[in-house]
Amino acid sequence: MNDSEFHRLADNLWQTIEARLDDWDGDSDIDCEINGGVLTLSFENGSKIIINRQEPLHQVWLATKQGGYHFNLKGDDWICDRSGEMFWDLLEQAATQQAGEEISFRG
């Protein structure tokens, strides 16, 4: 994958997250901000989830209260380089814990 393809795929990831939050009708207020390639989710309790792109490595990084994760694209899925878990699974687990209610980013 070249740099422009990586950015296109990361942009698609950001847009999906933002669209799911725009459509979400849960009780918690979750703010989504994108600034310079970094996506920040801010929760009512003051906690944050930060997702950023690491262009030199063609990785997406996820920082949550539970820890940090690095994802490589394998086929159509972003997969954690340590645990083998999917990006969406880890993001949903962290967001659910930090929001205090179930959050899904998959349509």
Curated annotation (Swiss-Prot):
One Pfam assignment: Frataxin_Cyay
UniProt xrefs under Gene3D superfamilies: Frataxin/CyaY (3.30.920.10)
Keywords assigned by UniProt, alphabetized: Iron, Metal-binding
One GO cellular component term noted in the UniProt record for this chain: cytosol
A GO MF label: ferrous iron binding
BP GO annotations: iron-sulfur cluster assembly
Transmembrane residue ranges: none
Top-level lineage group: Bacteria
Keyword Ribonucleoprotein among record annotations: no
Keyword Acyltransferase in annotation: no
Similarity comment: Belongs to the frataxin family.
Functional description taken from the UniProt entry: Involved in iron-sulfur (Fe-S) cluster assembly. May act as a regulator of Fe-S biogenesis.
Record-linked NCBIfam families: FeS_CyaY (TIGR03421)
Protein name: Iron-sulfur cluster assembly protein CyaY
Organism: Enterobacter sp. (strain 638)
